[in-house]
Swiss-Prot record:
Keywords: Aminopeptidase, Cytoplasm, Hydrolase, Manganese, Metal-binding, Protease. This is Probable cytosol aminopeptidase. The lineage of its organism: Bacteria, Pseudomonadati, Pseudomonadota, Gammaproteobacteria, Vibrionales. Mn(2+) 1 binds at residues 274, 351, 353. Its EC number is 3.4.11.1, 3.4.11.10. One of its GO terms (cellular component) is cytoplasm. Gene3D superfamilies: Leucine Aminopeptidase, subunit E, domain 1, Zn peptidases. It comes from Aliivibrio fischeri (strain ATCC 700601 / ES114) (Vibrio fischeri).
Length: 502
C-alpha cells in the first residue's frame, strides 16, 4: 500500500474519496465546512436531516456531491471536538480504513490528520495514522484453505497536512510509521505462528533471514552444545523436556559511525510453547501459550524496524528460544540449578521458567559491555492482575533508563508503567538450599520476578518490560498485538536523535 502527504484545499482534490471529520452534535470540521460551502450546503442539509450525528466511529459515504471533483466523500464521526484524544483518534483511523476497504475506494485523500488531537503534532498524527492503517489491514490467514479477498482493496492513501512547511515532517512520519508497522507485522506473524511451526529453530531461521536481507545485520546461533560449554545450565534445564533443541539467536546491528561504540542490547523471552513443564498449566487456554515467545517476537520486530530505519546505533537483539514441556527428561520442582553467573537457584515451580532462561541470557550479554540492556518477556500472570491488558509493566535498576522508556511509551502510545523494586521484595526469593528460589510467593509476583532478574544485571543499566497482559488478545479476535515493538523503536529513535526531526 502506498502512502504520501500533500498540502492543499479539499475542493481541488481529484480522488476516489475524500475523508473529512464531523463532530458532535452534527458539526462540520473546518475542512468539511469548506466542502459544504462548495457543494451549496449539500452536506450540512444531510446532517440537519439526522443522517449523521458525529458520534465516534460513525460513517456516512456520499456519492457525487455537487461541485466536488472527487467521486465520493466519507464523513467520519469524531465525537466532541475538545475530547478527541489519542486512543479515539487511532480508533477513528482504523474504522475509516475498514470502511474504505469495504466500499471499494482504492485511493483516498484523508484530512483527519488535520484534526486537533490534544498534545499531539502533525508528525504524531501522520505516523499514528500509518501505523493504525497497517494494523487495521493486518490479517493472518496462512493456514486457511480458503483465503477471503477484498475485491477492490485500498491501495493508496494521501494524508493532508495544514501547511507546506509540514510536508517534510509528514514524509518523515510516514517513513517512521511504515518501518514500525513492518516491525509490528513481523512480531505479530511470529507470535501467531502455531507452535508446531514456530519452534526455537524457526526463530533462528527468521534471525538468519534478517541478516540475509540487511547488510547492517549479522546473526549468530548458539545451540545446546555451545550453551553447555558456556555454563548456561539454567537456560538448558528449561528446554531439556522437549525434543526441540533450545537455540539462542543473536542479531547484531551495526549502524553507528564508530563500529566499536557500545551497543544497546534487547533480549526477548522466546518460549515457543510453555506447557508449564512438570508444574503443568490448566488445559483451558493452553493453546495461547504459543504466545509465550512474544517477547522474542517483539525484539525481532524492533530489529527489523531498526534495520529499515538505518539508525546510527549499534544494537544487539537476542531471541532466547526454547520450549517448556513435561517428559521424563524435564527439570523438576526441587532441582537446584547453577546459572551461568555462578549463582544457584532452587526450582520451586517449573512454570516460572522464563526467568531461568533470561537470567543466563542476561549474563551472556555482559561480553558486549552494553550501554544498556532491555529485556522483554510475557513473564508473569501477576502483571495482568496488576495492570490488565492495556499497559505493560516496567522494572529497572537505573532511573534515567526507566524514564527514557516511559517517555518512549507515552510518545508511541504503547504504554508502560514503572513498578517499584525495593530491597524488601528480595526477601521473598530466599531459599534454605540455594542462593534464591525461582518464585517469591503470590504477593507482588511481577516485582519479585523483576528482583530475580536484577540479580543477573548488576554490571550494566537494565530494564525489564513485562508484556504478559499486552502481547496478545484473547477471544473472538485472538491474536498477537506486536507490542511493545512501537515502544522499543521509539526508544531507539530517541537514542539516535531522530525521533521527529524535520
Amino acid at each position: 500500500m502506498e502512502f504520501s502527504v500533500k498540502s492543499g484545499s479539499p475542493e481541488k482534490q481529484r480522488s476516489a474519496c475524500i475523508v473529512v471529520g464531523v463532530f458532535e452534535p452534527r458539526r462540520l470540521s473546518p475542512i468539511a465546512e469548506q466542502l459544504d460551502k462548495i457543494s451549496g450546503g449539500y452536506i450540512s442539509s444531510l446532517l440537519r436531516r439526522g443522517d449523521l450525528e458525529g458520534k465516534p466511529g460513525q460513517m456516512l459515504l456520499l456519492h457525487q456531491v455537487p461541485n466536488i471533483l472527487s467521486e465520493r466523500v466519507l464523513l467520519v464521526g469524531c465525537g466532541k471536538e475538545r475530547e478527541l484524544g489519542e486512543r479515539q483518534y487511532k480508533d477513528i483511523i482504523k474504522k475509516t480504513i475498514s470502511t474504505l476497504n469495504e466500499t471499494g475506494s482504492m485511493e483516498a485523500v484523508c484530512f483527519l490528520t488535520e484534526l486537533h488531537v490534544k498534545g499531539r503534532d502533525t508528525y504524531w498524527k501522520v505516523r499514528q495514522a500509518v501505523e493504525s492503517t497497517k494494523d487495521s489491514l493486518y490479517t493472518f490467514n496462512q493456514f486457511k484453505s480458503n483465503k477471503p479477498e477484498t475485491r477492490r482493496p485500498l491501495r493508496k492513501l494521501v494524508f493532508n497536512v495544514p501547511t507546506r512547511r509540514e510536508l517534510n515532517l509528514g514524509e518523515k512520519a510516514i517513513a517512521h510509521g511504515l518501518s514500525i508497522a513492518s516491525g509490528v507485522k513481523a512480531s505479530k506473524d511470529l507470535g501467531n505462528m502455531p507452535p508446531n511451526v514456530a519452534n526455537p529453530a524457526y526463530l533462528a531461521s527468521q534471525a538468519r533471514r534478517l541478516a540475509d536481507d540487511y547488510e547492517t545485520v549479522t546473526t549468530k546461533i548458539i545451540g545446546e552444545e555451545e550453551m553447555k560449554k558456556l555454563g548456561m545450565t539454567s537456560y538448558l534445564a528449561v528446554g531439556q523436556g522437549s525434543h526441540n533443541e533450545s537455540m539462542m539467536s543473536i542479531m547484531e546491528y551495526k549502524g553507528h559511525p564508530d563500529p566499536a561504540a557500545k551497543p544497546i542490547v534487547l533480549i526477548g523471552k522466546g518460549l515457543t510453547f510453555d506447557s508449564g513443564g512438570i508444574s503443568i498449566k490448566p488445559s483451558e487456554g493452553m493453546d495461547e501459550m504459543k504466545y509465550d515467545m512474544c517477547g522474542a517476537a517483539s525484539v525481532f520486530g524492533a530489529m527489523k524496524a531498526l534495520a529499515k530505519l538505518n539508525l546510527p546505533l549499534n544494537v544487539v537483539g537476542v531471541l532466547a528460544g526454547c520450549e517448556n514441556m513435561p517428559s521424563s527428561n524435564s527439570y523438576r520442582p526441587g532441582d537446584i540449578l547453577t546459572t551461568m553467573s555462578g549463582q544457584t537457584v532452587e526450582v520451586l515451580n517449573t512454570d516460572a521458567e522464563g526467568r531461568l532462561v533470561l537470567c543466563d541470557a542476561l549474563t551472556y550479554v555482559e561480553r558486549y559491555e552494553p550501554e544498556c540492556v532491555v529485556d522483554v518477556a510475557t513473564l508473569t500472570g501477576a502483571c495482568v492482575v496488576a495492570l490488565g491488558h492495556h499497559i505493560s509493566g516496567l522494572i529497572s535498576n537505573h532511573n534515567p533508563l526507566a524514564h527514557e522508556l516511559i517517555n518512549a511509551s507515552e510518545q508511541s502510545g504503547d504504554r508502560a508503567w514503572r513498578l517499584p523494586m525495593a530491597e524488601e521484595y528480595n526477601e521473598q526469593l530466599s531459599s534454605p538450599f540455594a542462593d534464591m528460589g525461582n518464585i517469591g510467593g503470590k504477593a507482588a509476583g511481577t516485582i519479585t520476578a523483576g528482583c530475580f532478574l536484577s540479580r543477573f544485571a548488576k554490571k550494566y543499566h537494565w530494564a525489564h518490560i513485562d508484556s504478559a497482559g499486552t502481547a496478545w488478545v484473547s477471544g473472538a479476535n485472538k491474536g498477537s498485538t506486536g507490542r511493545p515493538v512501537s515502544l522499543l523503536v521509539q526508544f531507539l529513535l530517541n537514542r539516535s536523535g531522530q525521533e521527529n526531526e524535520e
